[in-house]
Amino acid sequence: MTSTHLPATLLLLGSGELGKEVAIAAQRLGCRVVAVDRYANAPAMQVADTAVVIPMTDAEALKQVIREHQPALVIPEIEALAVDALAELEAEGITVIPTARATAITMNRDRIRDLAAGELGLRTARFGYASSAEELSSAAEPLGWPVVVKPVMSSSGKGQSVATNPEELQQAWTAATQGARGSASLVIVEEFLRFEQEITLLTVRQKDGPTLFCPPIGHIQERGDYQCSWQPAELQQSQLLEAQRMARQVTDALGGAGIFGVEFFIASGEVIFSELSPRPHDTGLVTLRGQNLSEFELHLRAVLGLPIPSITSTGAAASRVVLAGADQQGGPVHYRGVAEALAVPESELLLFGKPEARPMRRMGVALASGSSLAEARGRADTAAQAVALEIGG
């Protein structure tokens, strides 16, 4: 087995709540963590050995900080990055997780969709692309109504909307272009799937060893952003095997080591590929409660070349996010109801430590276990609903 010599220096590009859990898992293995993001006091910076603030889309700033710290591994945790700089650094011998190419492909919905549907032939929703409002109208018409319109470059549901008729396409075009990351004006338009489930299949590619899969995670999204998740999701065996086949195929095409969050729809009993993130997934926060090894521990073991003897479910588990209110903005942030949340049996609460609130921003998550998925989900919901934010003071 090819493993990274420990202790190693790991550099996180992105320091949000998922990066924070990666940093904690890394430090438990004796690693030194450098947390980089565009704003100070980001969640992972609060536990890292070193914190650096730079414009994340500035290629020169990104190259400078990586060359300065000479990490054993560069671990991207967000999508808004100067990916061309990562390719240049990789050519210099810096290891990017999973690879610079995979990072570049998956930050663009058109590139990952072209790979999955075009090159690999995976089943996806019917879709088209448009670079103007006029092209959007032409691309949407054959798909039927409603349609989903998204920027090809965005995250957390930014710029995503549903158009129920041709008259709403101009508004959808405006929302997509305004919500896009950078100056990209290309949008993807998809048929609206009436699905039974949305699932995440966390897929682990090892340096040496077979691809492994976590128990499937069910989740619900609103405004294109994760609201709750539960594990294990209830799938037919044939559906699980098909999801695993598709996940293995697309992650093999991307290459590299680490955990991949592969999202699927289950619609009319069929498994349909949706999206992919080459890193721990927000819906996978539930693995802190539902598995013997969390997605963050698995990611670290995979990228460091350490063994993963097994991935097993520890029972029914669920998560529910704690959101800022629709009118809450700024900081400092204070929390009420924490004691009430922690009084819920078999529950825990993670408050991410984000320095400022924004409307509907994810500020924490409640996790819970139970004798059934219904009990676990009910407990997570109760704990999350007990928490309220106060701004200022």
From Swiss-Prot:
Residues noted as binding ATP in the record, renumbered to the chain: R109, K150, S155, S156, G157, K158, G159, Q160, E190, E191, F192, L193, E198
SUPFAM superfamilies in UniProt: Glutathione synthetase ATP-binding domain-like, PreATP-grasp domain, Rudiment single hybrid motif
Entry-linked InterPro entries: ATP-grasp (IPR011761), ATP-grasp_carboxylate-amine (IPR003135), ATP_grasp_subdomain_1 (IPR013815), PreATP-grasp_dom_sf (IPR016185), PurT (IPR005862), PurT/PurK_preATP-grasp (IPR054350), PurT_C (IPR048740), Rudment_hybrid_motif (IPR011054)
Domain ATP-grasp, chain residue ranges per copy: 114-304
Chain residues that bind N(1)-(5-phospho-beta-D-ribosyl)glycinamide: E17, L18, E77, D282, K354, R361, R362
PROSITE patterns given in the database record: ATP_GRASP
Pfam families reported in the protein's UniProt record: ATP-grasp (PF02222), PurT_C (PF21244), RS_preATP-grasp-like (PF22660)
Reactions catalysed, as given in the entry: N(1)-(5-phospho-beta-D-ribosyl)glycinamide + formate + ATP = N(2)-formyl-N(1)-(5-phospho-beta-D-ribosyl)glycinamide + ADP + phosphate + H(+)
Entry GO CC: cytosol
Enzyme Commission number, as recorded: 6.3.1.21
Keywords for the protein's UniProt record, in alphabetical order: ATP-binding, Ligase, Magnesium, Metal-binding, Nucleotide-binding, Purine biosynthesis
Biological process terms in GO annotation: 'de novo' IMP biosynthetic process
Pathway: Purine metabolism; IMP biosynthesis via de novo pathway; N(2)-formyl-N(1)-(5-phospho-D-ribosyl)glycinamide from N(1)-(5-phospho-D-ribosyl)glycinamide (formate route): step 1/1
Keyword Magnesium appears in the UniProt entry: yes
Binding site for Mg(2+): E263, E275
Superkingdom, taxonomy of origin: Bacteria
GO terms assigned for molecular function: ATP binding; magnesium ion binding; phosphoribosylglycinamide formyltransferase 2 activity; phosphoribosylglycinamide formyltransferase activity
Complex formation: Homodimer.
Entry similarity comment: Belongs to the PurK/PurT family.
Biological function: Involved in the de novo purine biosynthesis. Catalyzes the transfer of formate to 5-phospho-ribosyl-glycinamide (GAR), producing 5-phospho-ribosyl-N-formylglycinamide (FGAR). Formate is provided by PurU via hydrolysis of 10-formyl-tetrahydrofolate.
Protein name per the record: Formate-dependent phosphoribosylglycinamide formyltransferase
Origin species: Synechococcus sp. (strain RCC307)
Organism classification: Bacteria, Bacillati, Cyanobacteriota, Cyanophyceae, Synechococcales
